[in-house]
Amino acid sequence: EICACLVGSEMCIRDSTYISWRWLGTESADTRYNIYRSLTEMSSYGQKINNEPLNATNFTDLFIASDDTQYFIVPVVNGEEQWDKVGAVQLWDNNYMDIPIQKPENNKVNGEEYSYTPGDASVGDLDGDGEYEIVLKWDPSNAKDAAQAGFTGECILDAYKLDGTRLWRINMGPNIRAGAHDTQFMVYDYDCDGKAEVACRTADGTIAGDGSVIGDANKNYAVVSNGKNLTGPLYLTAVSYTHLRAHETCADL
């Protein structure tokens, strides 16, 4: 199902409304779009505001919309409007969207306390509802470059819906050091089932979204002198929303 997500931010100058939406990978290259504006919530689809079907994924409506204005972005395929793939969107209150996130609790490693700050993020439709979710990496305050010695706190990945609902949390565990060179992740629909997976490197002790543990939960391979895992196995894991238990885990990398 297609919807116009991340759409409808009223411009600061308030003399127009800028609308943007996604062109999905499942849509053909010749897909066009019509935009309808409805001035009353829950009313009809209103009036079409573009003259010809658009071959872009953004549009500026020279109209000062009210809070209850709704927009409908309708795909046009072979000259036919695809109304079965349409959802209504409303204006944001600001030029950005506030999404509440849940900061992990402070923790300690080797007796030293660390805290968390949000780091890298990526987007994908994790649950197949046509709306993006956000995958966010939490970096501990003692994160280190791969060349640096020292213990780090545990790296954490969260998945959030746009209203702030947390879908899952993955704790990378003690055998994945926290740092930009150690945890990268990819969000993509690898198996083409309409729901994106999250692929990343894991190790013994990584806790998946359902609380299950990958590998041996009791193993800690961190070298006392530098905090690095130089001998323990590493895995490539894909996690899906419907299989929070680590959808697929490859053998030792």
Model-derived features: where do they sit?
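Single conserved hydrophobic/aromatic residue that forms the stacking wall/gate
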Residues: 1-8, 13, 243-246, 250-253
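Structural beta-strand segments of beta-rich domains
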Residues: 17-19
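Beta-propeller-forming repeat regions
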Residues: 23, 28, 34, 54-245, ...
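Extracellular low-complexity, O-glycosylation-prone stalks/linkers
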Residues: 31-43
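Surface-exposed loop/edge segments in extracytoplasmic proteins
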Residues: 41-51, 166-167
